[in-house]
């Protein structure tokens, strides 16, 4: 497989989800319980009114893919969550920054508690910050 395609790999199934609200609210999913496994973290906008954040385009939610800590602000066009599937469509720019495909579909192997954490967290994070960065389609 060419290196350019290798950087676009994402897991088929996500098996863990969690949230943290100590400083900035985050919700994340990962491929396994292994702390080094592939992960996707959604961070709520911290200060949408800050002039520097606005000038840098950091006045909205943030996504981080690990390992590697690839980061982008905004960029989710569509997000759809069901009991067993998470579908994301990103802008090409966001996908390039995160080293992921622009369209991703994940199977979910989450219990009902973790699924509710993810549902609540995605709704909270993806509607934070600049209004024009909110996904055009958000079904959670």
Residue ranges of predicted features:
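Acidic, aromatic-enriched beta-alpha/helix-loop junctions
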Residues: 37-80
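Extended Gly/Ser/Thr-rich low-complexity repeat segments
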Residues: 36-49, 97-111
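Mixed-charge, glycine-accented linear interaction segment located at domain edges/termini
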Residues: 98-140
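Short polybasic amphipathic segments
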Residues: 27, 60-62, 86-89
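A broad structural signal for short, well-ordered beta-strand segments within beta-sheet-rich domains
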Residues: 7-14, 67, 71-76, 118
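A short, structured beta-strand/loop element
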Residues: 81-96
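A short, structured loop/turn motif at beta-sheet edges
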Residues: 80-84, 111-114
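Charge-rich, low-complexity N-terminal segments
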Residues: 1-40
